[in-house]
């Protein structure tokens, strides 16, 4: 799968509520009402990621969870990352 151009990424971002491009990846941080709500969201995203065989990097800090998407094997952001960002929004709410 090809790495997306800057223009393609910029065109996709308006449809990805809460996501930004930072440090070569798509990133979104979400603050949950409680630590366990964040953990539950991570579990739901992890189950979906397993089914798609495309896994985000996930950072958990008390009630804040940050998802980062980049296709390491391709060396950049691909359509799979854009699709997974959209899927994550559907799972956790935009």
UniProtKB/Swiss-Prot annotation:
Q: Does the keyword Cytoplasm apply?
A: no
Per its record, the protein catalyses: (4aS,6R)-4a-hydroxy-L-erythro-5,6,7,8-tetrahydrobiopterin = (6R)-L-erythro-6,7-dihydrobiopterin + H2O
Q: Which Pfam families match?
A: Pterin_4a
Which terms are listed as keywords in the entry?
Lyase
Lyase: is it a keyword of this entry? Answer: yes
Q: Which GO terms describe its biological process?
A: tetrahydrobiopterin biosynthetic process
Write the Enzyme Commission number(s) for this entry. Answer: 4.2.1.96
A molecular-function term among this protein's GO annotations: 4-alpha-hydroxytetrahydrobiopterin dehydratase activity
Q: Which CDD domains match?
A: PCD_DCoH (cd00488)
Family assignment from sequence similarity: Belongs to the pterin-4-alpha-carbinolamine dehydratase family.
What is the protein name given in its UniProt record?
Putative pterin-4-alpha-carbinolamine dehydratase
To which species is this protein native? Mycobacterium avium (strain 104)
Q: What is the lineage of its organism?
A: Bacteria, Bacillati, Actinomycetota, Actinomycetes, Mycobacteriales
